[in-house]
Amino acid sequence: MRIISYREELKQQIIDLILHIQNEEAKINLPLQQQPDLLDIRDFYISRGGEFLVAIENGVVIGTIAFMNYGDHNAVLKKFFVQAEYRSQGIGLALYKKLLGVLVEQGYKKILLDTPAVTVKSHHFYEKAGFKMISKQELPFHYEYPDRDSLLYLLVL
């Protein structure tokens, strides 16, 4: 397994993986049309100062993680997914550590994320990584997201 920065030729695999996990596994009913960032990853992430990392195994996308730059040393963690058969093998942790290294290196101070309430295993991961659950009223900066009974987490570096 290797982790690389986003490449355009991986776009469809990325979309397929994310939509499958969101809609088939988590059943949150979030169509591609409500995720314009997936249709133009380069513009929404890379060109705006963020990053989009991809875990690859034998040429196949098996995981993703990204962050969007929200200015003033603020970032939003996005699109953190690992294909079901590769979970609990350290791939998610490797993706997270690599992205966290980029965030620290670039001087980010606050990392926000939203996650569906039904994805309980991910909540444990975030809490173990130092994220604290917050309310909408505690958002440290303006952030809009497709709320699917979502929980918000914040990490202060």
Language-model segments: which ranges?
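Short, conserved glycine- and acidic-residue-centered signature motifs
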Residues: Q34, G92, P146
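Extreme N-terminal starter segment of soluble prokaryotic enzymes
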Residues: M1-R2
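Acetyl-CoA-dependent GNAT
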Residues: S5-K79, Q83-A84, Y96-K98, V102, ...
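Conserved glycine-rich acetyl-CoA-binding loop
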Residues: V60, Q83-K97, V104-Q106, I111, ...
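C-terminal "cap" of GNAT-fold acetyltransferases
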Residues: Y6, K109, P116-V120, H124-L157
